[in-house]
Amino acid sequence: MVAGNRSAKLYTAGQNKDVPTSFGHTIHTHYTFAEVHSAYFEALALPGGFARYDYFSTANDDEFLRIIKEFAAENKPIAAVCTASILLGKTGILNNRHATTYQGENGRWLDQLATLGAQVTTEQICIDGPIITGSGPSSAIPVALKLLEMTIGHKTAESISDMMGF
């Protein structure tokens, strides 16, 4: 459950139920990608990751791409932090939309996002309709707060923001 009025629930999904992390830990997910259908969820949030740790293998996972496309087709909020914007771009949902991504590595990811059809910005957070993209790890909390605002309302998101000192 998410703090505030406790009306939001957070669920995790992965290619498998046990997902190894870049730093040697394992995340036990609630669902596999095949089990996720947008009809049962209000929003989608995607964390970024490191290319050198095979983060982008999900870009070749048909079930993962289906999930993104389903949420986009239903105009449901989608949040992507850091390099997760690249995964959104690979589905085509960022074509002619404003978006941002990780700005380090001499703009490598910004350039890739542009080649995927996005209108690239260098803002910390970019909102284009129901899609929220964040520029890097430091954008994670502001992106999450915006996603909460879109799903459970401004007042609750503001209350959570205040509790967290933002």
Short names for language-model regions:
Residues 1-78, 86-90, 112-122, 131-166:
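Extended, subdomain-level signal for the structured scaffold at the beginning of enzyme domains
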Residues 78-79, 99:
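A short beta-strand/loop micro-motif in the catalytic core of glycosyltransferases
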Residues 82:
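Catalytic, metal-anchored helix/loop core of enzyme active sites in primary metabolism
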Residues 127:
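Cytochrome P450 catalytic-domain "roof"
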Residues 94-121:
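A conserved active-site-flanking secondary-structure segment within enzyme catalytic domains
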